[in-house]
Amino acid sequence: ARQEAELMRVPVFVELTEQAIAEGNAVVAFFNFRQSLEAYRNLIREESTEIIGDQKDDDRVRNIADFQANKVKICACMIQAGGVGLSLHDLQGVPRISLIAPTYSAIDTKQALGRIHRAGALSPSRQYLLFANGTVETQIARSLRRKLRNIEALSDGDTLGAIL
């Protein structure tokens, strides 16, 4: 059910991506399922790059560098592969937007939220957690909110700001 809900939402990711690109932004889209990521990349009209778990280190480094240099304005990431140790914040003056499919893992979500929002970024970032209301994702969003609030409480309230 989760995979189907995420796959059904791919056209929304595409529409938001195209709108963001038309407004002069770069986009990072985070997915939980490879099928959704591939469908997204097949539907978007702009060139894109990807960060996935089974890619070679050289490919990953090149894809990150191309996105950071704004050679490519769209980066599609598997949320588990695009979390730790990845900086995709604005270094060139092109604002970043992240579109995030919800996951049960608060840690993965927190990591995804940190990819484009960094000290030293040249422009503000915007981040959207997109879930399909009335589906299993509503439950996921509620569970995620509880987990993120627990993390927030443990860290003295300084990590998540207005998303809660």
Regions found by a protein language model. Name each.
Residues 139-164:
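C-terminal or mid-to-C-terminal helical accessory/interaction module adjacent to the motor/catalytic core
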Residues 37, 49-139, 147:
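Conserved RecA-like P-loop NTPase helicase motor core
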Residues 1-46:
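Conserved helicase/translocase motor-coupling segment
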Residues 27, 123-126, 154, 158:
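Short, polar/charged, Gly/Pro-enriched helix-capping and turn/loop motifs at alpha-helix termini
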Residues 1, 24, 42-62, 101-105, ...:
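Generic structural signal for short, solvent-exposed loop/turn connectors between secondary structure elements
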Residues 14-18, 41, 64, 113, ...:
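Short amphipathic alpha-helical segments and helix-helix/interface helices
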